[in-house]
């Protein structure tokens, strides 16, 4: 059986402003320059550790990244839905696909945050985030394999918006549908071998269906 697996940030949910706010709250506390949302757009994708390391830049050597991460998590876990919302049309697309196929959401965010966001915006849809007992995270195949096992599927179409997603799909021999409303531009995705694209959420279900039948 084939499933449909989605990335979360930049694919289903517009989390950019909440991630930017949490990062800047953290940067201010540790004496580092803030980032604009435009800058953050190209940092997001590999999880909060990488995000914070990139945002700190040359100041990374001056701080304890574990303390930085703990401070960030304490803020973001409380404010993760302040400005976050689904991209227009994606809820309808996910619900339509869920009537035909096993559907899941797999994110590098901590599992507790993923579960809360998905319960709020995609109730009833399988959700999996990073857990201590389930590493390494994407783009390694472990989380995808776990999701497929839980869904009773043996393969998938994977939907995402970053280079990490393209590599994730490649690592499980799955076709990757790249959405173009997320955190990366088409040329960045093509540079890592992306072949399938979706420009609007109105076309999302049909684009997935095409790959499911391919």
What does each model-identified segment do?
Residues 23, 90-118:
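Substrate-recognition element of Asp-dependent hydrolases with the DxDx(T/V) motif
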Residues 196-200:
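Short acidic-hydrophobic, aromatic-tinged amphipathic segments that line or gate anion-handling sites
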Residues 181-191:
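Short, glycine/polar-rich helix-capping loops at beta-to-alpha or helix-loop-helix junctions
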Residues 98-101, 150-154, 211-212:
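Glycine-rich phosphate-binding loop signature in dinucleotide/nucleotide-binding domains
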């Amino acid at each position: 059986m084939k499933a449909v697996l989605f990335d979360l940030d930049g694919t289903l949910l517009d989390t950019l402003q909440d991630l930017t706010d949490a990062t800047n709250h953290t940067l201010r506390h540790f004496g580092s320059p803030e980032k604009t949302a435009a800058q953050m757009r190209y940092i997001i994708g590999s999880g909060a550790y990488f995000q914070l390391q990139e945002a700190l830049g040359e100041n990374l050597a001056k701080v304890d990244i574990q303390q930085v991460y703990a401070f960030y998590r304490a803020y973001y876990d409380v404010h993760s839905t302040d400005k976050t919302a689904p991209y227009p049309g994606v809820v309808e697309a996910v619900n339509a696909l869920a009537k035909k196929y096993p559907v899941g959401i797999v994110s590098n965010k901590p599992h507790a945050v993923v579960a809360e966001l998905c319960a709020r915006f995609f109730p009833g849809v399988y959700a999996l985030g990073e857990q201590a007992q389930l590493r390494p995270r994407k783009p390694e195949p472990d989380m995808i394999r776990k999701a497929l096992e839980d869904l009773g599927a043996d393969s998938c179409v994977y939907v995402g918006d970053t280079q990490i997603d393209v590599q994730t799909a490649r690592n499980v021999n799955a076709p990757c549908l790249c959405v173009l409303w997320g955190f990366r531009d088409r040329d960045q995705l093509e540079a890592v071998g992306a072949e399938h694209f979706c420009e609007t959420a109105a076309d999302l279900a049909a684009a997935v269906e095409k790959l499911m039948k391919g």
